[in-house]
Amino acid sequence: MTLLSQNELRELVLANPPLVENMIDMDTQLQPNGVEMTLKEIRTIKSPGAVDFDNSGRRLSEGDTIEFNEDGWIHLDPGVYKVLLNEIVNIPKDLAAIAKPRSTLIRCGATLETAVWDAGYSGRSECMIVVHNKDGFDLKKDARIMQLLFYHLHTEVEEGYSGSYQNENI
């Protein structure tokens, strides 16, 4: 696997379909080695979830949307929250992606948990933010919170992602 550069990412963002759409400011969000993804919505997690081998018993945790204040800010107490991103990704069958939190989150006592973005996946992804700071953490709507790193696969996958999260949150 080879990590894509800013130049390669720009070409793919401008392609049809775009690698990443609904960007707030492409020039700001395109970084030397990835695309910064932004905050659309935060939800609480207030019920248990479940996962099994064949997904017959899968149950997603329920939660409520936390509203931004009149200035566009949310204060998060220590804990775990779901995050919905602004951007929609359209990953071709010769790429995959992984995400890392922006270092500012870590310096403030918060981090993100994410999964792999599979070749062929399209959708508006969710991830999890964990606030470790005992005093909490403040986030503004549209804040750049993660960097999505795209990797070129040695060969294109025969069949791209086709799971239940395909085209999610669009």
UniProtKB/Swiss-Prot annotation:
GO biological process, one term: dUMP biosynthetic process
Top-level taxon of origin: Archaea
Annotated catalysed reactions: dUTP + H2O = dUMP + diphosphate + H(+)
Enzyme class, UniProt record, top EC level: hydrolase
Keyword Hydrolase appears in the UniProt entry: yes
Pathway(s) served: Pyrimidine metabolism; dUMP biosynthesis; dUMP from dCTP (dUTP route): step 2/2
GO molecular function, one term: dCTP deaminase activity
TM helices/strands, residue ranges: none
Signal sequence, start to end: none
InterPro entries in UniProt: dCTP_deaminase (IPR011962), dUTPase-like_sf (IPR036157), dUTPase_archaeal (IPR023537), dUTPase_trimeric (IPR033704)
PANTHER family: DCTP DEAMINASE, DEOXYURIDINE 5'-TRIPHOSPHATE NUCLEOTIDOHYDROLASE
Family membership: Belongs to the dCTP deaminase family. Archaeal dUTPase subfamily.
Protein name stated in the entry: Probable deoxyuridine 5'-triphosphate nucleotidohydrolase
Natural source organism: Methanococcoides burtonii (strain DSM 6242 / NBRC 107633 / OCM 468 / ACE-M)
